[in-house]
Amino acid sequence: MSLDAATLALVAGELKNTLLDAKIDKIFEPTRDEVLMTLRTRTETHRLLLSARSGSARVCLTKESFENPLTPPGFCMLLRKHLTGGRLIELRREPGDRIVYFDFRCTNEMGDLVTNTLAVELMGRYSNLVLVQGGRIIDALKRVDFDDSEVRQLLPGLAYTCLLYTSDAA
């Protein structure tokens, strides 16, 4: 079942109430389309599942156990580098659309505080996770180059633009 914008608004509100100010403890990529984060609040530990599977894209808290690969995939390693230890300072969504932004306050390799945003785009077969800093893409779970799309590319270093779903129906 696909997640519509109204349902996502409710889910995002619940996640914000539960996870705001939580600290990222661990990050895993159990499958090529899913990321699992362990976040700690002052009182609890939560497991956040971010799925970019085309048939079941979703964002939710889970108690389910996942088997992780022995060697973490590249995107997982990148998320660990840029997000582990960061605090969730804001959770927002694109109004009327199926995109949720997780803003994390993190320390970079120079020791400076930076805000890294994980954009979770839940758009059916175009679902994706995109890590952004300062409006520029650090990387995406599913890279999109010009051969894949003339409209929007998702490659490291490019400016991030959100994918807005528009209907041409009159």
Q: Predicted regions span which residues?
A:
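Conserved small/polar residues in nucleotide/adenosyl-binding loops
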Residues: 165-170
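Acidic, proline/glycine-enriched N-terminal capping motif
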Residues: 1-164
